[in-house]
Curated annotation (Swiss-Prot):
Gene3D superfamilies: Vaccinia Virus protein VP39. It holds the Pfam family PrmA. One of its GO terms (molecular function) is protein-lysine N-methyltransferase activity. It is found in: Cytoplasm. Its EC number is 2.1.1.-. GO terms for cellular component: cytosol. HAMAP family: Methyltr_PrmA. It comes from Actinobacillus pleuropneumoniae serotype 7 (strain AP76). This is Ribosomal protein L11 methyltransferase. GO terms for biological process: methylation.
Length: 293
């Protein structure tokens, strides 16, 4: 069976609305891509992480009247009348097989691997987290997730408690548990994230050591030895008082989801309470870590 796809650029705020609309008018799948054709990997709390320059790609049956699709998009007012788009025919493939072939085990730091369940574990003696791609899991990890995983791998988590603030799929909390943490707590504003984290913890045999809370139900006196938050710079600054109280004295803090250009302003929000390490950059993103005073 042949296919045809439409690709259009969108703002962050409108990308998900356009995705929903394309599905309503017949798209069999919709993918978010960044400017470098990288699919989305790790969701933010309550939403799909979208880059500032996001392409929305809708796949349709080859017999679809694409002129009508374009007209419907314009009529929806989700795009301008002269919006830039590209329509192209796609050769018939075994899409499920190709989709699965794109996912490979990935190593973070010295000990940690993230592996899809259908792939053979490269090193049985390593710390292996089995995580199957979902809607927001791309062909490679987003730099901010990689930065957080590498940081967790560098810590001695033996016997410690870890809070994953904005847990999404639970990947960071689960990795911490597999790396030796005694207990992990995942917090998110999205019930779907809580469900996904629980399912992924079950698949990795650590569900009995993972507590999950919606942000509104977070215990008032909650604290941990290690807190990691892979969200955006805005929320990291706005929620700084809350995040700071989650870290025990002499505890470790790891923050990401931050553009390198935003590092200074985020550091200013945490510097009074933490001895901060040098900022670590990966591509245009960065990680901020420190020890609570």
């Amino acid at each position: 069976m042949a296919w045809v796809q439409i690709r259009l650029n969108s703002t962050d705020k409108q990308a998900e609305q356009i995705s929903d609309f394309l599905e309503e008018i017949g798209a069999v799948s919709v993918t978010f891509m960044d400017s470098q054709d990288t699919p989305i990997f790790e969701p933010l709390p309550g939403e799909t992480r979208l880059w500032g320059n996001t392409d929305v790609v809708g796949l349709f049956d080859a017999e679809t009247d694409m002129k009508a699709i374009v007209e419907a998009l314009i009529a929806s007012r989700l795009v301008e009348a002269d919006f830039v788009h590209k329509i192209e025919q796609i050769e018939d493939k075994d899409w499920e097989r190709e989709w699965m072939d794109n996912f490979h085990p990935m190593q973070f730091g010295k000990r940690l691997w993230i592996c899809p369940s259908w792939r053979e574990v490269p090193d049985p003696n390593a710390v292996n987290v089995m995580l199957d791609p979902g809607l927001a899991f791309g062909t490679g990890t987003h730099p901010t997730t990689a930065l957080c995983l590498q940081w967790l791998d560098s810590l001695d988590l033996t016997g410690k408690t870890v809070i994953d603030f904005g847990c999404g799929s639970g990947i960071l909390a689960i990795a911490a548990l597999k790396l030796g943490a005694k207990q992990a707590i995942g917090i998110d504003i999205d019930p779907q994230a809580i469900l996904a984290s629980g399912n992924n913890a079950e698949a990795n045999g650590v569900a009995d050591r993972l507590q999950l809370f919606l942000a509104k139900d977070q215990p008032q006196d909650l604290q941990a030895d290690v807190v990691v938050a892979n969200i955006l710079a805005g929320p990291l600054k706005e929620l700084a008082p809350n995040i700071i109280t989650l870290v025990k004295p002499q505890g470790d803090l790891g923050l990401s989801g931050i553009l390198a250009t935003q590092a200074e302003s985020v550091c200013e929000a945490y510097a009074p309470d933490f001895n901060l390490d040098p900022v670590v950059e990966k591509e245009e993103w960065c990680r901020i870590t420190g020890v609570k005073k």
